[in-house]
């Protein structure tokens, strides 16, 4: 499907409230300096309006707003204010450094809030809206009014509140689904009817601010756009009060991917989405779940064999957007118990192995057996499987025993030779590895001069394995080999045998020795 939109496509304004509503999420508070760092990222992301804070609530918020105002000159910087004169005056003062300031005033309108929170009548609410929007407009030309709990407000009264706010000078009307109560059909109809019927609606921007209590924040925001909203309020990673807000990464990519359907776009620089998401995760210490849309670790990961096979044929079979479009480097083929042979073979090719049919079959059988022991198979695991497959033509490690003999070590190794016979040898050395390599040299008849030897861990947690890497010389020629095992001494033996077996195969085939590197 064609997801592109023309240059004449209408544009939605993205109002990011990560630094205000998002920060209200428990555990997500930020210092003024952290807010400035996040605001810079939102600016680079292309956000149109950044809600910077609630100045009347704290000195910290006032400081953060002033810092952002001095530095960020492109986006509109908004601050939240209750319908109180002192709040509005404080907010206006906090915005004095901003190049493009916006005062965002709000008042509850639903019967539940009027009765139990405000203790105000309809008439008192209307009077307060008129008075405080007028006051705000006296300070700043760009004024947004939010009818808190709009989706639980009687629609006739909501229409009257909207009319009064527009008449008083509001330039944006926000109709929030404050508690995530509404449904897409309801909010689409609400926006459509109010925009069609309220006097002056054609002179302002209508905005949606949807919470995620029922998991519908993005769906409701999209429906509001269908109903005529031209601003969406959202947060990075969907953080916010309770279950959070409409997620910026989800709403913007929905509009981009389904551009032919919505025929509306945003100015978001989508390749910066993932880095912005990860920055927020670091700042507030709240990681997103792996299956989070767009920015989760599994968003572009495929393990199912059927899905992997389709992806190898054409990525569009199981991906509706490119990972590069949102800032991921590429899709991930996660190798695990659900993976098929095609994905394993493709990954082996990427690691540099060109296998015959029988070799692929053997490695895949070993791969499936390994999947019964651990959840994910890494590249190092595949390399270890390749080692097992390739050494079958040469010596194989049957057993080994390492023991201390005073200040020295003793190694006993038992190998299976290419004909299947058992060969056992012992050797002493200055340490377990020195003794081990001496015993292997005696058993195989191959003499190797060790240049370097390294060990490190590969994999994660209980699935971690030890990898041994060595560089050796034989007849003046350098060789490299690796071995992987749960036991690091065994990994060292496998690395040594990797080189020895290749040397023996070269000797049998009459291959002239030269520098070679093995990944096994």
From Swiss-Prot:
Role description: Catalyzes the condensation of the acetyl group of acetyl-CoA with 3-methyl-2-oxobutanoate (2-ketoisovalerate) to form 3-carboxy-3-hydroxy-4-methylpentanoate (2-isopropylmalate).
CDD domains assigned: DRE_TIM_IPMS
Query: Which stretches of sequence are listed as region Regulatory domain?
Result: 396-520
Where it mainly occurs, coarsely classed, is cytoplasm
Family the entry assigns: Belongs to the alpha-IPM synthase/homocitrate synthase family. LeuA type 1 subfamily.
One GO cellular component term of this record is: cytosol
Annotated source species: Xanthomonas euvesicatoria pv. vesicatoria (strain 85-10) (Xanthomonas campestris pv. vesicatoria)
Q: What is this protein called?
A: 2-isopropylmalate synthase
Q: How does it assemble?
A: Homodimer.
Which leading EC class covers this enzyme? Answer: transferase
On whether Ribonucleoprotein is a keyword of this UniProt record, the answer is no
Catalytic activity line of the entry: 3-methyl-2-oxobutanoate + acetyl-CoA + H2O = (2S)-2-isopropylmalate + CoA + H(+)
Q: What gene does this protein come from?
A: leuA
Citing just one GO molecular function, the answer is:
acetyl-CoA C-acetyltransferase activity
